[in-house]
Amino acid sequence: LNDIVLAMPVFSDGKLIAWTADIAHNSDVGGMAPGSLTGDATEIFQEGIRLPAIKVISQGETIQSVMDIVIVNSRMPDTIYGDVWAQIAAVRIGAKRLQELAKKYGANVFERAMVEFMDFGEKASRRELAKLTNGVFELSEEQDDGSFYNVKITISDDLFTVDLRDNPKQLSSPVNSTKDGVMIAAQMIFKSMTDPYSPCNGGSFRPIELITEPGTVFRIAIGN
């Protein structure tokens, strides 16, 4: 819950052309323990404030009531206030740069360039993926509680499959993950194995297939 994501729509001549976004790990977002991290939590409500998708800036102005909700739930209100504003500044600067590009080259050229940029990322990943040894690779690792986490990775010329279905059921402790959270880990592994040095984009991860089982530690069921 410490990781707060901010996203901002980017418009050019009234047309939505992109989004800028950032994510930051905040020092404390409430919960039962300082730092909002504890191995004793048995449900997500003990880990801090949960923020749904909610508008914090409207027409360029702060919605202070929303900002106050974040601040008053932190043991470090001044710190989180500054960190959230740093995130706001970052997405604003990103949006400004994209608007400058769209103004210089035109929105249509900008949008085509973004599509080609994503396609370029995919081509680069597939080129490097084809260099990896094809096969099925499996690993089981014992955890502190005695259970085993299992992963099966299948590599072909055009697909990198991560199969996590054979794993323990979700637990009443802070060891579970969402499928999206696991996908981030899979993307990091894939990037480090294929093309670790060049910038990446959404297209870079198109060759990844992630398979998880609902209700397990790697795909927790809603409400737990």
Region spans (language model):
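Short acidic, glycine/serine/threonine-rich loops at helix termini
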Residues: 1-3, 21-22, 29-35, 63, ...
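Accessory "access/gating" subregions that flank catalytic or transport cores
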Residues: 92, 96-169
